[in-house]
């Protein structure tokens, strides 16, 4: 989405300074029609971590050049062992860290914020409806607060078009297999941390 491209350009421009902290929050109140995600054995996966957790973690990771060193998480589990709310801390080393909160119990939200010594950038709605303009809030020590409007766009159409170009024009995909590997590795480590109630090294 052009909204996220603008955020990444803001971070890379260094007007915020080196990013030392990021936070993401993704949630929606789960409806009975979706209880299959949490109302069964978790042997084959399920719960909020594997549902909306990938978005929260991937969003955070884009702020840092490094892969994380360790994670710590806590969760609220139901009678099937499915996490319906999970919060955690990701340590990227060198005093760089991120927190996340994902839930099937909270009101709908898809928020993200990154902080540097010189400023911060906030995305109030990551999953912006295709028919609505997106908004980005930038607040720097030198220029103060500004709000930018990004043209409306359809996430899914953009994704499909990019996928088609990767195949037809042999271009490099925006997301690599290594990126996917690390996202899955972090999610698995978060799951392990919940189970063991401890820090887990990656």
Regions found by a protein language model. Give the residues of each.
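Contiguous beta-strand/loop segments that form the cofactor/metal-binding neighborhood of enzyme cores
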Residues: 57-130, 150, 160-170
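Short polybasic amphipathic segments
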Residues: 112, 130-141
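C-terminal helix-rich "cap/oligomerization" subdomain common to oxidoreductases
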Residues: 13, 93, 148, 164-202
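A short glycine-threonine-serine/GTX helix/turn-capping micro-motif
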Residues: 44-50, 145-154
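A general structural signal for well-ordered alpha-helical segments in protein cores
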Residues: 4, 56-57, 131-133, 157-161, ...
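Predominantly a Rossmann-like dinucleotide-binding segment in NAD(P)-dependent oxidoreductases
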Residues: 1-72, 79, 197
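Short acidic, glycine-rich loop/turn motifs
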Residues: 90-94, 137-144
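Loop/helix-junction capping segments adjacent to catalytic residues or to phosphate/diphosphate-binding pockets
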Residues: 1, 108, 157, 174, ...
């Amino acid at each position: 989405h052009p909204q996220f491209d603008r955020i990444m350009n803001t971070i890379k421009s260094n007007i915020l300074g080196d990013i030392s902290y990021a936070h993401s929050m993704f949630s929606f109140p789960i409806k009975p029609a979706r209880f299959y995600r949490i109302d069964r054995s978790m042997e084959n996966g399920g719960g909020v971590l594997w549902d909306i957790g990938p978005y929260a973690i991937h969003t955070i990771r884009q702020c840092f050049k490094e892969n994380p060193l360790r994670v710590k998480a806590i969760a609220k589990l139901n009678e099937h062992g499915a996490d319906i709310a999970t919060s955690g801390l990701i340590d990227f080393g060198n005093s760089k860290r991120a927190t996340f909160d994902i839930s099937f119990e909270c009101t709908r939200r898809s928020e993200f914020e990154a902080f540097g010594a010189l400023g911060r950038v906030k995305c109030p709605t990551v999953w912006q409806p295709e028919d609505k303009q997106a908004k980005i809030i930038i607040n720097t020590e030198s220029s103060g607060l500004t709000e930018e409007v990004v043209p409306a766009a359809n996430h899914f159409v953009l994704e499909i078009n990019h996928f088609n170009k990767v195949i037809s024009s042999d271009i490099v995909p925006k997301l690599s297999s290594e990126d996917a590997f690390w996202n899955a590795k972090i999610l698995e480590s978060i799951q392990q941390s919940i189970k063991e109630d401890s820090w887990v090294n990656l």
